[in-house]
Amino acid sequence: MDEPVVEVETHIAAKPDKVWAAMTARKSPMFMGATMDTDWQPGSDYTLKGEWEGRGFTDYGKIETALAGRELSFTHWSKTPEPPESYNAVRYQIMPAGSGSKVTLTQFQRGKPQTFDDKTRAEFKKNWSMMLEALKKAAES
């Protein structure tokens, strides 16, 4: 069962289709300069390669849902290729909001139960908020 770990949201002055296009670009600013290799089809694997705080990384996962302009979800793992039961899940929901969009990102825990302290949850929230801010800037430009 998926357990929500953290949720963040932002309002973007762009229609959902423009938010979707910015979100699914191969070098989406949302991924902070990293490159996402996938075909965005449910069931497809992806790799996200880039640099964070001066260190290279490769993240892994599988696309779960890809409903253009509405919802994107995928599993996520940040260290080495691990079995899927170790992955987190991330869901972006895009809702029309006035002349723009509301985007809600939820990170879920899967697999082995883990307890996250307040400091860790705050770090997750900070990182996801930075990603949404980058998405906002890209979609609004």
Predicted region positions:
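Hydrophobic ligand-binding cavity/cleft-lining segments
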Residues: 1-38
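Hydrophobic-ligand binding "helix-grip"
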Residues: 36-39, 54-102, 108-110
